[in-house]
Amino acid sequence: GEAPAGAEADTVKGDALDLPFDDGSFDRVIAAEIFEHLPNDTAAMAELCRVLRPGGIAAVTVPSWLPERLCWALSEEYHTVEGGHVRIYTRAELEAKLKATGFHIGPHHHAHALHAPYWWLKCAVGTDNDTHPAVAAYHRMLVWDILKAPRLTRTAERVLNPLIGKSVVVYLRKPLDRAGDGV
């Protein structure tokens, strides 16, 4: 949703391995599509847990295994670019790492199924080839879908998300105490 009227926010530049916030600074945190880029993902996960207050909720997203694996198979360039993806997670691997850093694992779902074919096209024709007719047409469709949210594409995405959702979303809770029994 949108921020309520009068809400304020600050932009802070930081390092995912050493966040510039005190322990327990946030009630809610989101880590969207970052862990797959970091060689030391577990340190970043621990930092996320550190800045979340006990009882706080986190949402983490990473690329889903199947769509990401297809991108890697279609394009060496997709995953060897500097700063690019250094790993592909299964949901079980991601959840095990998050649990090991102190989180309780909650529900999960897949999202952005209509985005997976777009990335497969880009991987097939070149990740920088935004002018390819198929890539450009698919991009226009995605923008239209985002802006208009027509029933047809919303239904298609809801049906396809469990199969080819580009991202997996995992919800987490930080225990009230480090023993983990206070949630």
Predicted regions mapped to residue ranges:
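Conserved S-adenosyl-L-methionine
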Residues: 103-113
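A generic secondary-structure signal marking the coil-to-beta-strand transition
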Residues: 58, 85, 166-168
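Acceptor-substrate binding/catalytic loop of class I
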Residues: 76-93, 110-112
